Amino acid sequence: MGAKSMEGMNLKQTAIADFHHVSVLPTALVEGLEPKPGGYYLDATVGAGGHSERLLKLGIPLALTMIDRDVQAIAAAMERLQPLVADRKDISINTWQGNFADFPGQLEQFDGIIADLGVSSPQLDQGDRGFSFRHTAPLDMRMDQSQDLTAAEIINHWSEKDLARIFYEYGEERLSRRIARQIVEQRPFQTTTDLAEAITKWVPGKYRHGRIHPATRTFQGLRIAVNDELGSLEKFIAQAPHWLKSGGKFGIISFHSLEDRIVKHRFRETENLRVLTKKPIIAGEEEQRQNPRARSAKLRWAEKI
């Protein structure tokens, strides 16, 4: 399935022991997909395989292609799903490692497409990936470890103007100019904790004991820039409807207002899509209690016409 297909790769060689992720809105996503026997479905952000697992547990014959930028995510998903498909000749699974915006989809290929955006819990929790300031790690933040651009490259080499722009536009950080100016004056920075501690010192005292850590928005902006998350989402939504058969469902879970705004407006503006959710579907109180990540999740659906 292309240069980045995982077929034939020994996934056992990939470290997956720590890649555990609880999927959000699993019931709403699978039910909204309306799977049918013999259907062909695309999980565009497989993560650890939670949503695909729900789909396979329906027990119907189907074909499934799973995408993720992170090779560890695909390995974890395959290990998780193997018991469900080991004796099923009527189920076909393909994997493709890379950015969903670059997937070589074909015209009217799928009966349904789902995507769960953003960074996964294992990526946040694995200290060496550099996504979180809870762990001391190199400033990395790459979802795809084969790409060249890292958070360290951005922090230590981009201009003050560009740093302020990504912190403001992608992180919605009101102190973006102040933080960018201090970074340029005091760089280089090598680790997540060095940067986070410095940001904490630079912001006014009233921001140091708020609901979120003073570095949270800066780190979000940095991560989105490293992985071109919003640009990739725009490209994906522009292409994916062409891969859907007529009547096929397209569901996307977003986790912050920037993503949700793109999904909402692109679904509405795309001529061959009909919006099925005037308001986004959100997690119930019980799911939010069990999985705090679900609190910010919003699911929107569209249908190919």
From Swiss-Prot:
Where is this chain's protein located in or outside the cell?
A: Cytoplasm
A Gene Ontology cellular component where this protein is annotated is: cytoplasm
First-level EC class: transferase
Q: Which UniProt keywords apply?
A: Cytoplasm, Methyltransferase, rRNA processing, S-adenosyl-L-methionine, Transferase
Which GO terms label this protein's molecular function in UniProt?
A: rRNA (cytosine-N4-)-methyltransferase activity
Q: What is its EC number?
A: 2.1.1.199
Binding residues annotated for S-adenosyl-L-methionine, in chain numbering:
G49, G50, H51, D68, F100, D116, Q123
Quickly give the catalysed reaction: cytidine(1402) in 16S rRNA + S-adenosyl-L-methionine = N(4)-methylcytidine(1402) in 16S rRNA + S-adenosyl-L-homocysteine + H(+)
Record's HAMAP family? 16SrRNA_methyltr_H (MF_01007)
Q: What does this protein do?
A: Specifically methylates the N4 position of cytidine in position 1402 (C1402) of 16S rRNA.
Family membership = Belongs to the methyltransferase superfamily. RsmH family.
**Any idea what this protein is called?**
Ribosomal RNA small subunit methyltransferase H
